[in-house]
Amino acid sequence: LRKVPADEIKNRVMHILDLVELTGMEARMTNQLSGGQQQRVALARALVIEPSVLLFDEPLSNLDAKLRVSMRTEIRRIQQEVGITAVYVTHDQSEAMALSDNIIVMNKGVVAQMGTPQEIYYHPVSEFVADFIGEANFLKGTMDCLDGDHAVLRVEGHPARVPAKEGMEPGKEYTVVLRPESAALRDEGGLPCTVALSCFMGSYQNYHVTVGNTLVKLTDYNPKNKRVYQVGESCSLAFDPESVHIL
């Protein structure tokens, strides 16, 4: 139907099989391939016709977690090697971050934000976007005053320094977006809190703490030789003012 000469068809097929690392498996039936190999066959079929744009509609949703990570790495490698424009539809935030040069976050059919993965993650325009891309804590605070390039907010009755943004006014309420990896627990010097969950996960320690009536999630990487806070302990929630985003 595409009127491609037989020799060119063969050359394209062999090139694409090599690209998706399926050389030597040309004669195998579908039921003789693993889940990951079947995904590569589907990708090869799409690439061999040399489309100008390739649409992926949640292609990894039926694979197990480890295979998903492996396949998204392969898809990114192949996309960059071929140089094709790809539109990748997914509800998996980690896939979106790992595969994209630019991300469009949709909310009920409307574009909520468009930008690079870094822009979306570090500078979300709304709570919806912040919560959709990665985990996020939201601390409500009323502005006390400006302090140079920073503002002082009252969070659950306690002062917290955050980056000042244009148009901030004393007495108005703002939302602090705090990522779990940007927060830390200290004996003192931060927002008073109480540990609600302390869970060792191998390479990191998960904490849930309550700051007043607000639950905050923290991820403490490389916990070896660090103090581990236990459930019920009182301590302080600390963060670098430059690591948070204000809405």
Give residue ranges: language-model regions.
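Glycine-centered flexibility sites
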Residues: G24, G35-G36, G109, G115, ...
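ABC ATPase nucleotide-binding domains
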Residues: L1-F128
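Non-catalytic connector elements of ABC transporters
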Residues: A136, L146-L247
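ABC transporter nucleotide-binding domain
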Residues: T116-G148
